[in-house]
Amino acid sequence: MAPPKAASHRPAVRRKKSGTLVDSILDKYLNVRFFKYLLLEPAALPIVGLFVLLAELVINVVVIQRVPYTEIDWVAYMQECEGFLNGTTNYSLLRGDTGPLVYPAAFVYIYSALYYVTSHGTNVRLAQYIFAGIYLLQLALVLRLYSKSRKVPPYVLVLSAFTSYRIHSIYVLRLFNDPVAVLLLYAALNLFLDRRWTLGSTFFSLAVGVKMNILLFAPALLLFYLANLGLLRTILQLAVCGVIQLLLGAPFLLTHPVEYLRGSFDLGRIFEHKWTVNYRFLSRDVFENRTFHVSLLGLHLLLLLAFAKPIWTFFQSYVRLRRIEDQLQPQITQQNLQLKAQKRPKKVEKDKDKDQKKFTTEQQSFLKAFEKSLQKASGGKATPAPAQAEPERYGIHFDRCTQLALLPFFLCNLVGVACSRSLHYQFYVWYFHSLPYLAWSTPYSLGVRCLILGLIEYCWNTYPSTNFSSAALHFTHIILLAGVAKQLIQTMRINNAAKREQQEQQKKLQ
């Protein structure tokens, strides 16, 4: 990679020599080029994200005020928590109108707090606004990840957020516990990418304590731990997750441990066929057949094994780039300080600075390979550096390497969703916010990517599910997985070619 490019990515706009400040602002921002930048350039997502959050605030308020609330599980949640608050710690005795309590202890504590805040669960409108806050907070965390990765154009996220009726319904009209678990999960992902490991492990374990579907991310997290921390520190983080589960479950484990484990972590629970979104075309007998369940579990494990090597390679590349960032960032900071301190240094000082601050050949080749691989993986073209232009400041957007971390996490979750024994409508939040990222991680055309997202939205909005909607959902999952797999193979080839090129350059230097 050539010396770092200027950090600014906004389109250049000619400025008038004279005029008021207002004229200057209008000339700079109220033009077609700037609007195209906001819609198409991933680097503009932090700006666009603010408008998305403000618009979503209005949308959620309108939905709460105008669309009737639908009671499904809220009353049952309150009944289950009321039993706990009355002193019952036997999970087999904690029940609601829809059946026994089947969620871990963190769910009980969170919804017990909501029980008190909402006047024993009677103030549903207040609960709806609390869940609107959960929605906005989670969306902010999701947008932060997308902003770091710079992979998906802003207009895709805008359309995805504004057009999903089902997602808004799940959050503010149904009050399910799935949004709470997913919120904690995205908080954990943000913390992991900030390298705040113990806090991230804490939030991940809390998410599992709300609902077990978060364990679908666990295979990727285990490899991420190992790649970043090594074996001993990985064991420490796993211990953090385990201790939190023990602390959360202590009131139940110390009194009725078997009932707690059987009730909250029941992997063999049979789902009702009438609520399935993905297997409507199967008969009830096949749907509830144990052999069918074991077959899906086997397929899940086989897919995880098939993706294990590229996932591990992605994580290793991510770790190497973070180490390069740690090496180069002090140099970049020093160069920016020098540029700020003096506009035109003397020639002697220039030569001295070049000798001291010049990136090593290994660093340059590694960064060049990284930039090339990410550009090809995202389908983008290299941005030519302006010839003989003196940058205002140096900068390398190292956070773009989060692409190497996010895709494996989202992919593992998608595999789990695709192989699920049954999907209910509220389960859409498990992977909804990762779908644009996954679609843009395929080599498909823009039209095919949008078609995939549109079909998935159609399937989840079809109520009750039909044979066609269930089959279409499986079809889109398969197409999406196949596209991601193809892109992974291409990226692996690019990575291997970059390694060979780097090795050849090192041999020449020797």
UniProtKB/Swiss-Prot annotation:
<dbReference type="GO" id="GO:0010804">
    <property type="term" value="P:negative regulation of tumor necrosis factor-mediated signaling pathway"/>
</dbReference>
<comment type="similarity">
    <text>Belongs to the glycosyltransferase ALG3 family.</text>
</comment>
<feature type="transmembrane region" description="Helical">
    <location>
        <begin position="172"/>
        <end position="192"/>
    </location>
</feature>
<feature type="transmembrane region" description="Helical">
    <location>
        <begin position="404"/>
        <end position="424"/>
    </location>
</feature>
<keyword id="KW-0256">Endoplasmic reticulum</keyword>
<protein>
    <recommendedName>
        <fullName>Dolichyl-P-Man:Man5GlcNAc2-PP-dolichol alpha-1,3-mannosyltransferase Alg3</fullName>
        <ecNumber>2.4.1.258</ecNumber>
    </recommendedName>
</protein>
<feature type="topological domain" description="Lumenal">
    <location>
        <begin position="65"/>
        <end position="97"/>
    </location>
</feature>
<feature type="topological domain" description="Lumenal">
    <location>
        <begin position="448"/>
        <end position="464"/>
    </location>
</feature>
<dbReference type="GO" id="GO:0006486">
    <property type="term" value="P:protein glycosylation"/>
</dbReference>
<keyword id="KW-0217">Developmental protein</keyword>
<dbReference type="GO" id="GO:0005783">
    <property type="term" value="C:endoplasmic reticulum"/>
</dbReference>
<dbReference type="Pfam" id="PF05208">
    <property type="entry name" value="ALG3"/>
</dbReference>
<feature type="transmembrane region" description="Helical">
    <location>
        <begin position="234"/>
        <end position="254"/>
    </location>
</feature>
<feature type="transmembrane region" description="Helical">
    <location>
        <begin position="465"/>
        <end position="485"/>
    </location>
</feature>
<keyword id="KW-0812">Transmembrane</keyword>
<feature type="transmembrane region" description="Helical">
    <location>
        <begin position="98"/>
        <end position="118"/>
    </location>
</feature>
<keyword id="KW-0328">Glycosyltransferase</keyword>
<feature type="topological domain" description="Cytoplasmic">
    <location>
        <begin position="486"/>
        <end position="510"/>
    </location>
</feature>
<dbReference type="GO" id="GO:0005789">
    <property type="term" value="C:endoplasmic reticulum membrane"/>
</dbReference>
<feature type="topological domain" description="Lumenal">
    <location>
        <begin position="316"/>
        <end position="403"/>
    </location>
</feature>
<feature type="topological domain" description="Cytoplasmic">
    <location>
        <begin position="119"/>
        <end position="125"/>
    </location>
</feature>
<comment type="pathway">
    <text>Protein modification; protein glycosylation.</text>
</comment>
<feature type="transmembrane region" description="Helical">
    <location>
        <begin position="126"/>
        <end position="146"/>
    </location>
</feature>
<dbReference type="InterPro" id="IPR007873">
    <property type="entry name" value="Glycosyltransferase_ALG3"/>
</dbReference>
<feature type="compositionally biased region" description="Basic and acidic residues">
    <location>
        <begin position="348"/>
        <end position="358"/>
    </location>
</feature>
<feature type="transmembrane region" description="Helical">
    <location>
        <begin position="427"/>
        <end position="447"/>
    </location>
</feature>
<keyword id="KW-0472">Membrane</keyword>
<feature type="transmembrane region" description="Helical">
    <location>
        <begin position="212"/>
        <end position="232"/>
    </location>
</feature>
<feature type="transmembrane region" description="Helical">
    <location>
        <begin position="44"/>
        <end position="64"/>
    </location>
</feature>
<feature type="topological domain" description="Cytoplasmic">
    <location>
        <begin position="425"/>
        <end position="426"/>
    </location>
</feature>
<feature type="topological domain" description="Lumenal">
    <location>
        <position position="233"/>
    </location>
</feature>
<dbReference type="GO" id="GO:0052925">
    <property type="term" value="F:dol-P-Man:Man(5)GlcNAc(2)-PP-Dol alpha-1,3-mannosyltransferase activity"/>
</dbReference>
<feature type="topological domain" description="Cytoplasmic">
    <location>
        <begin position="1"/>
        <end position="43"/>
    </location>
</feature>
<keyword id="KW-1133">Transmembrane helix</keyword>
<feature type="topological domain" description="Cytoplasmic">
    <location>
        <begin position="255"/>
        <end position="294"/>
    </location>
</feature>
<feature type="transmembrane region" description="Helical">
    <location>
        <begin position="295"/>
        <end position="315"/>
    </location>
</feature>
<keyword id="KW-0043">Tumor suppressor</keyword>
<keyword id="KW-0808">Transferase</keyword>
<comment type="function">
    <text>Probable alpha-1,3-mannosyltransferase involved in the N-glycosylation pathway. Involved in glycosylation of the TNF receptor grnd, regulating its ligand affinity. Required for normal epithelial growth and architecture. Suppressor of JNK-dependent intestinal stem cell proliferation.</text>
</comment>
<feature type="region of interest" description="Disordered">
    <location>
        <begin position="337"/>
        <end position="358"/>
    </location>
</feature>
<feature type="topological domain" description="Lumenal">
    <location>
        <begin position="147"/>
        <end position="171"/>
    </location>
</feature>
<feature type="topological domain" description="Cytoplasmic">
    <location>
        <begin position="193"/>
        <end position="211"/>
    </location>
</feature>
